[in-house]
Amino acid sequence: MLNVRDVLRAYLHGYFPMGDPDDGNVYWCRPRRRAVFPLDTYRASRVVRRLVRDNVFDIQINRDFNAVIAHCAKPRRHESETWISDEIVAVYLELHSLGLAHSVECYADGELAGGLYGIALGGAFFGESMFFRQPNASKVAFDALVRQLKLQRFDLLDAQIMNPHLEFLGAVEIDHEEYMRQLAMALEKKISFL
C-alpha cells in the first residue's frame, strides 16, 4: 500500500511512483535519463507571454488542488487509461494537506481551465502532471510555476520522463548521476514553495 513516508523517501532517492492501469499496481520508477527544466534558461513562448501579459487567465496557487489532481487523473484524449491511480491520488491529497504537494491553476471566467501539480522538497520541485480544458492553459500554469520557483530560488524542476510536450516547453534530459548530483544540492536548501 502506497503511503506518504515511502513516497517522500522515494523522491529523496531519485524514484517516483507510477500506477500501471493494466494490473492496478503502483511501481517505483527511476529512469536512466531524467527530464528536467533548467530554470535559469527557461523562456516562455511568445503565445504564453502574450496570454500572461493580457491576463487571459487568473492564475492561482493551491486554490483547488483536489480538482487539479482529479483532472490530471482522467485519461488523455485518445487514451483509455491513466497512470494516476486512486491510490496515488489519495497519497498526493495527503501530501497536499501536509503542505508538500502544490497546484498551479488557471481560471477563465471563474472556471478551472488548466493546471498542474507536484511536490516541493527543499529546493526541488517534482512536477507530476498537468492538464488543460482550454488551449494553452497548462502552458500558462507551467510558466507561473517557473516564475514561482525562480522567486523562491529553487534549483531543480524535475519533469521525470521526457515527452514531446515537455521538450517543447524546454525540458532537457540528463543522466542519472547528474540528476542525483543536482537533486542532492537542491535538497540541501531550506526554502518554501510559497
Swiss-Prot record:
Functions in the N-end rule pathway of protein degradation where it conjugates Leu, Phe and, less efficiently, Met from aminoacyl-tRNAs to the N-termini of proteins containing an N-terminal arginine or lysine. It comes from the Bacteria. It is found in: Cytoplasm. The keyword Magnesium does not apply. GO terms for molecular function: leucyl-tRNA--protein transferase activity. GO terms for cellular component: cytoplasm. Disulfide bonds: none annotated. Transmembrane segments: none annotated. The keyword Acyltransferase applies. Belongs to the L/F-transferase family. This is Leucyl/phenylalanyl-tRNA--protein transferase. SUPFAM superfamilies: Acyl-CoA N-acyltransferases (Nat) (SSF55729). GO terms for biological process: protein catabolic process. Its EC number is 2.3.2.6. Gene3D superfamilies: Leucyl/phenylalanyl-tRNA-protein transferase, C-terminal domain (3.40.630.70). It catalyses: N-terminal L-lysyl-[protein] + L-leucyl-tRNA(Leu) = N-terminal L-leucyl-L-lysyl-[protein] + tRNA(Leu) + H(+); N-terminal L-arginyl-[protein] + L-leucyl-tRNA(Leu) = N-terminal L-leucyl-L-arginyl-[protein] + tRNA(Leu) + H(+); L-phenylalanyl-tRNA(Phe) + an N-terminal L-alpha-aminoacyl-[protein] = an N-terminal L-phenylalanyl-L-alpha-aminoacyl-[protein] + tRNA(Phe). Keywords: Acyltransferase, Cytoplasm, Transferase. Its main location: cytoplasm.
